[in-house]
A protein has these predicted regions:
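A conserved beta-strand-loop-helix scaffold within acyl/acetyltransferase catalytic domains
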Residues: 49-56, 66-174, 214
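Conserved acetyl-CoA-binding loop-helix of GNAT-fold acetyltransferases
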Residues: 174-187
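Active-site catalytic microenvironments for nucleophilic, acid-base chemistry
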Residues: 110, 184-192
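Active-site/acyl-donor-binding loops of N-acyltransferases
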Residues: 52, 62-69, 196-236
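Nucleic-acid nuclease catalytic cores
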Residues: 161, 165, 169-175, 192-197, ...
Length: 236
């Protein structure tokens, strides 16, 4: 598989840093087998492309995963788990759904004030959901009665389940839906007999990514191998 370097752009996580990515060839279909190998080397998927940071002045991004058999809930996570036992979860193939898109728009307005579901964000949403690169992707749809309150896009490969993106009802923040989605994915990964839940990149110093270190044990891909990260925030 061929790879290319992206053009540099501002880092979305750390100020005063530029982001440079290694990207897979968009003319080649990823497929589950190829992506499984790439995921284990620190790559992630966005639409039909696999990518990995290759920033010239920074190596803060650490690909992380949870060994699901060894994970134990802490007190706060246990409360979130119990609080959301009234939710139903359906596993679906990726598809367009207007209610999901509307929920995504509400979530984006919370995460990016002043934004919303404009034409560009709608296009990005469609690409994220529908362009899977030949990878076995699923939508996890969390509902309260008949109302969809959270949606998680995940990939399934032999190495485990990879959490691609999760969005949820911002007005239900007291439920901890983002945390519950991760906890549910861990239980589901275990039920599938798979070893790891991949959470993407953890970036020390980024408030957006700090939540990932609360799941223990947490393994990071550092210096070409996976290892358990220390309880403190520094990965190196």
């Amino acid at each position: 598989m061929a790879f290319y370097l992206s053009a540099p752009q501002s880092c979305p996580y750390l100020p005063d840093q530029d982001e440079l990515l290694i990207l897979s060839d968009p003319q080649q279909v990823l497929g589950s087998a190829s992506y499984d190998a790439l995921l284990q080397k620190g790559f992630r998927r966005n639409g039909g492309l696999a990518y990995r940071p290759a920033c010239p002045r920074c190596d803060a991004c650490v690909s992380v995963r949870i060994p699901v058999e060894r994970f134990r809930l802490d007190r706060g996570q246990r409360r979130v788990w119990q609080r959301n036992q009234d939710l139903q979860v359906a596993v679906r193939a990726p598809h367009w759904d207007a209610a999901h898109a509307a929920l995504f728009g509400r979530y984006q307005r919370l995460r990016h004030p002043g934004g919303g579901m404009d034409e560009e964000s709608l296009r990005l949403y469609q690409e994220m959901i529908l362009e899977t690169g030949g990878v076995d992707a699923k939508l996890l749809v969390f509902s309260l009665a008949a109302e969809v309150v959270a949606v998680a896009l995940v990939d399934i490969v032999p190495a485990g389940v990879s959490a691609v993106y999760t969005f949820y009802a911002p007005e239900m923040s007291a439920r901890g839906l983002g945390v519950y989605a991760i906890l549910w994915q861990m239980a589901w990964t275990r039920s599938l007999g798979l070893p790891h839940l991949y959470l993407g990149y953890w970036v020390p110093g980024s408030a957006k990514m700090d939540y990932k270190r609360r799941y223990r044990p947490l393994e990071g891909f550092v210096a070409g191998r996976w290892r358990v990260l220390p309880e403190t925030t520094g990965a190196r």
